[in-house]
């Protein structure tokens, strides 16, 4: 909010990291560079590669139906999270990942990042910050001569982990599954042949300078990436300008403008459909891989066009990967514009008033045309898809700030008002069908012509066009005050009231929430000696609302392309109340031995109430669902960090920091009438189910039938018998969220050399791999090959034929569920996340003109893991889908060089 305070006066936990933490070893999505560097911060990258989004979580999942992502604040102003929703998490496959705001930020523009993990810390930002806030401060011009900084970060990427395949048994008679006879020679490893060495370069040039009355900052950055998947490219460009004026002695004006553009081609998409990895991993062993690579299409005289060439072109989840990359290529183009400004008037030395405004616009075009014969024969004449997404946000606020001291007393106060106006829109163009012969018989004139004019009736009779606009407004008033005594005791009070248009048709469209906090610097009240620099206790209590989605409180009718108005199937939620998170936090901060040792410890407990649920409506209402407010999700845990800096001599120093967090989640209440709990995510034979007394992320899996002695039971064919996939027949397999996360950073300086590394990990949680289940079901896994060599699979003393076992317990068809109990793994893992070795060439190009060169590496190796995939990568950023592997793009090990030049 533009409010500045000394860290030692804060009554809540807040951690600030420098810009070097995200730009020394860069990630294309800069938030991923913070993995393992802060207690209580969990970052899960999506499995879509460059330009993809990431799930960010502070202190556990709180909202069942709403968002759990924190607010992103840039230079004090809340920002839009993304252009549109990110990739839909489904085992069938999500076609797009719209990215997030973090992927549009140039890490070289960042001066610092402050992590506000608790509700008390972010209460002034209102409902949008119910899950905490990430405050990013960007660089600005400094008075003095113009300074130029140039940086270039170049890395090469290779897959960190690949599945293990058998190379002994080939295809059966259908040319699909690898349950055939032994091969005369070992099969090629198609995955090793398919993936290439990726290449990414990230470059920035910036200029800053000015005088006392005018300061300016300008930067240009770009990213060029050729992914590990063939034909995958990503590029982005960023422009950033900030200027500050001193108009009068007491009037200050600043203006900023930013523009970013992103282009991605063949971005990875987890799931079965639209994913080249299904063909790479499932291709029958022993085929001529190079033949299908060079001849991925053949001419079909009946359709008059080239069609897919593959061992079996009828299966939708199984295609030639090179056809997918060249003939059903997803292309995404994104633009983001941002303009902002502020004016501040220092009325007196103690009193000022400021006004700020920022406008943001996001645009995306997503093109995913599929040539004839794509996805089996689902699109016999091809499919056209051209979607456009738009979002706008206008934010403004006015704040009055007062700061004064009287002898031992001090008062800092802020009061203000803000408004946020958000609009979204999307226009979808989609067409597919059969070859046109006459009116009423077919609708596509020519295959693979992706224009509306190629469709009979210009798509109007297909009903495939779609358009939607939304608008939301949020107005607020707020105030905060801090009273200080002897610069040692601090009391914070804050309050905010929001008016949300999403609640317009309810009894009350506003909601109020307060917070209170206190901190005591005991070292300033009681003599503790020179070795104690800070000895601080703090505590806070807050209530923060979480706004609700639009159009829940009013019936919404839909106008179809044909002119027909369709009635809603959900009852309006006229008694809707926003979620509210009640949070308590206590902690200790200390620094000792001339600030060489620092220690921080925090305990927190949150209860998020008034959750909103969709439940079945009474039959006589004629509606399908209705909404209710209910539920209480509790999170409580501990965060701790300890750091030490040792200066051994003028040339040699060592700095180390260790952080660890523990979070325990508990569902205290749910809506009545849910006998089998609430399912928030499901896959083939696996469900994430919430139950009272359980935890957010509880995983239930399908199991095989066993006798009273616990031994597997066979059917007449000698196959294991699957139990049902209703929750009451499923098996609890654990919780998908780790309770403990940690990170350990070390930095050594010797003269002009710098060496650093980061080890991080987590303990607990579960990972579900549909990839491994499918490899087993198709007979291509190393595990299935070993079993066939042995001639049997032995499970708890019962022998099975390998094919009978794996085609039943594994996945041989993505429409069928399987025994997921055998494909759940421990999420515990410890890895060497980052490492860097650099040298600074001082005064290389003149006095003060230095060059720093560093060898950098990321995701080098695991010290320990149980899962066959990277446990920290997920197929989506939605609720309940972390830790799921459905042919996800492998994580990358990157090695490279980082250069920085200043003059």
Where does each model-flagged region fall?
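Outer-membrane beta-barrel signature, preferentially recognizing the C-terminal barrel domain
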Residues: 326-328, 456-476, 558-600, 626-649, ...
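Outer-membrane beta-barrel transmembrane strands
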Residues: 196-212, 220-224, 235, 321-368, ...
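Conserved small-residue
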Residues: 149-184, 427-439, 628, 645-736, ...
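Small-side-chain secondary-structure face that scaffolds active or pore-lining regions
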Residues: 227-238, 246, 258-272, 328-436, ...
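Surface-exposed loop/turn segments flanking beta-strands in extracellular/periplasmic regions
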Residues: 167-186, 273-323, 368-382, 425-464, ...
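Extracytoplasmic gating/loop element in the C-terminal half of outer-membrane beta-barrel translocons
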Residues: 191, 466, 500, 762-852, ...
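Flexible loop and strand-edge segments within Gram-negative outer membrane beta-barrel domains
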Residues: 154, 158-161, 183-190, 200-221, ...
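Short, small/polar-rich motifs associated with maturation and membrane association
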Residues: 1-240, 245-260, 338, 345, ...
């Amino acid at each position: 909010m533009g409010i500045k305070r000394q860290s030692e006066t804060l009554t809540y936990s807040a951690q600030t990291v420098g810009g070097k933490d995200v730009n020394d070893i860069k990630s294309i999505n800069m938030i991923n560079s913070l993995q393992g560097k802060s207690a209580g911060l969990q970052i899960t990258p999506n499995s879509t590669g460059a330009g993809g989004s990431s799930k960010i979580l502070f202190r556990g999942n709180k909202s069942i139906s709403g968002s759990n992502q924190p607010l992103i604040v840039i230079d004090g102003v809340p920002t839009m999270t993304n252009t549109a929703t990110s990739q839909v998490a489904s085992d069938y496959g999500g076609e797009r990942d719209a990215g997030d705001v973090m992927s549009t930020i140039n890490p070289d523009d960042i001066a610092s990042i402050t992590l506000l993990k608790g509700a008390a810390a972010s209460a002034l930002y209102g409902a949008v910050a119910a899950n905490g806030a990430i405050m990013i401060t960007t660089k600005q011009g400094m008075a003095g001569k113009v300074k130029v900084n140039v940086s270039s970060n170049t890395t090469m990427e290779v897959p960190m982990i690949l599945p293990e395949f058998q190379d002994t048994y080939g295809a059966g008679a259908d040319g699909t599954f690898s349950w055939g006879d032994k091969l005369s020679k070992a099969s090629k490893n198609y995955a090793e042949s398919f993936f290439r060495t990726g290449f990414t370069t990230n470059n920035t040039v910036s200029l800053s300078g000015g005088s006392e009355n005018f300061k300016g900052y300008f930067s240009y950055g770009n990213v060029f990436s050729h992914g590990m998947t063939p034909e995958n490219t990503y590029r982005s460009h960023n422009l950033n300008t900030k200027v500050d004026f001193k108009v009068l002695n007491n009037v200050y004006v600043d203006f900023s403008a930013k523009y970013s553009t992103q282009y991605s081609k063949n971005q990875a998409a987890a799931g079965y459909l639209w994913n080249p990895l299904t063909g790479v991993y499932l291709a029958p062993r022993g085929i001529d891989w190079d033949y299908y690579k060079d001849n991925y299409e053949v001419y079909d005289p009946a359709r008059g066009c080239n069609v897919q060439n593959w061992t079996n072109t009828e299966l939708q989840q199984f295609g030639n990967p090179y056809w997918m990359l060249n003939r059903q290529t997803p292309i995404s183009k994104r633009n983001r514009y941002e303009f902002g400004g502020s004016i501040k008037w220092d009325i007196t030395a103690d009193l000022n008033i400021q006004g700020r405004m920022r406008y943001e616009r996001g645009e995306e075009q997503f093109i995913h045309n599929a040539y004839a014969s794509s996805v089996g024969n689902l699109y016999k004449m091809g499919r056209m898809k051209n979607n456009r997404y738009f979002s706008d946000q206008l934010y403004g606020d006015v704040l009055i700030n007062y700061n004064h001291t009287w002898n031992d007393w001090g008062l800092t106060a802020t009061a203000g008002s803000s408004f946020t106006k958000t609009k979204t829109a999307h226009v979808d163009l989609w067409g597919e069908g059969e070859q046109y012969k006459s009116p009423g018989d077919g609708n596509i004139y020519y295959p693979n012509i992706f224009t509306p004019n190629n469709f009979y009736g210009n798509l109007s009779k297909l009903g495939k066009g779609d358009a939607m606009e939304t608008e939301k407004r949020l107005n607020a008033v707020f105030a905060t005050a801090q009273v200080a005594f002897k610069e040692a005791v601090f009391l914070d009070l804050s309050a905010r009231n929001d008016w949300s248009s999403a609640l317009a048709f309810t009894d009350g469209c506003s909601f109020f929430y307060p917070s209170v906090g206190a901190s005591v610097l005991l070292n300033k009240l009681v003599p503790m000696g020179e070795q104690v620099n800070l000895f601080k206790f703090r505590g806070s209590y807050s209530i923060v609302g979480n706004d609700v989605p639009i159009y829940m409180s009013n019936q919404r009718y839909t106008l179809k392309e044909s002119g027909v108005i369709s009635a809603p199937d959900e009852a309006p939620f006229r008694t809707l109340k926003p979620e509210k998170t009640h949070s308590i936090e206590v902690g200790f901060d200390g620094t000792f031995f001339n600030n060489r040792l620092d220690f921080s410890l925090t305990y927190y407990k949150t209860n998020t109430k008034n959750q909103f649920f969709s439940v079945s409506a009474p039959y006589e209402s004629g509606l399908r669902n209705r909404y209710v407010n209910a539920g209480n999700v509790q999170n409580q845990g501990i965060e701790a960090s300890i750091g030490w800096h040792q200066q051994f001599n003028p040339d040699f120093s060592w700095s180390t920091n260790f952080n660890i967090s523990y979070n325990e989640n508990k569902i205290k209440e749910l809506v009545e009438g849910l006998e089998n709990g609430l399912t928030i995510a499901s896959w083939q034979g696996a469900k994430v189910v919430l139950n009272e007394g359980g935890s957010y992320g509880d995983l239930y899996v399908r199991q095989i039938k066993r006798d009273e002695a616990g031994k597997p039971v066979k059917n007449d064919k000698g196959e294991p018998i699957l139990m049902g996939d209703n929750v009451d027949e499923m098996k609890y397999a654990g919780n998908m969220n780790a309770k403990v996360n940690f990170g350990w950073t070390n930095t050594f300086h010797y003269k002009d050399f710098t060496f650093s590394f980061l080890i991080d990990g987590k303990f607990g949680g579960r990972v579900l791999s549909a990839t491994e289940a499918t490899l087993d079901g198709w007979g291509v896994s190393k595990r299935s090959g070993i079993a066939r060599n042995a001639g049997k699979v032995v499970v708890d003393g019962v022998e099975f034929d390998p094919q009978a076992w794996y085609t039943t317990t594994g996945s041989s068809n993505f429409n069928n569920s399987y025994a997921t109990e055998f494909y759940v793994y421990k999420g515990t893992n410890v890895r060497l996340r980052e490492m860097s070795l650099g040298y600074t060439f001082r005064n290389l190009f003149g006095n003060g003109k230095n060059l720093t060169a560093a060898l950098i590496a990321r995701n080098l190796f695991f010290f320990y893991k149980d899962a066959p995939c990277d446990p920290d990568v997920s197929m989506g950023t939605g609720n309940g889908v972390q830790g799921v592997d459905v042919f996800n793009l492998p994580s990358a090990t990157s090695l490279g060089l980082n250069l920085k030049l200043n003059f």
